[in-house]
């Protein structure tokens, strides 16, 4: 599962102010929708998170991972697209979709989803994108339903008891 933060786990962008990362909108709590993601991922313990957020470029991998407020989400983080592309000098200029497609190809992933507020770069894989609208994020009940449905389609493993 590739994860963008801004306009996904909270309903606005964020920026660095001094030593802190703050929401661009007054009154918005960063990671306000983290518990929703935690709830939706709960039935899928083997699904890891790859950070596809610009926070990695600003705070580094550990800083971005550790910014996640829930231990259950931090423990799922297995990598970041920007780290994986660090040998590519222009990788920071690629869209999230392009970074993710490179990661998928390099690691030969067969099953994946991405939560992002941008569609660019995902054109070849529209079914893998859980698109969050800017200003709403995972707070949108329709997006939550889409996420639940796509998680089932992509990661559900049938057992002998089903």
Question: What do these predicted regions represent?
Answer:
Residues 1-43:
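Active-site neighborhood of HAD-like aspartate-dependent phosphohydrolases
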Residues 3, 52-58, 115-117:
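Short His-Asn-centered micro-motif
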Residues 9, 57-59, 120-122:
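Short, active-site-adjacent cap segments at secondary-structure transitions
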Residues 28, 56-61, 89-90:
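Acidic-and-aromatic substrate-binding clefts and catalytic sites of carbohydrate-active enzymes
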Residues 31, 58, 140:
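Loop/helix-junction capping segments adjacent to catalytic residues or to phosphate/diphosphate-binding pockets
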Residues 44-64:
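Substrate-recognition element of Asp-dependent hydrolases with the DxDx(T/V) motif
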Residues 62, 66-162:
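C-terminal cap/substrate-recognition subdomain and adjoining C-terminal extension
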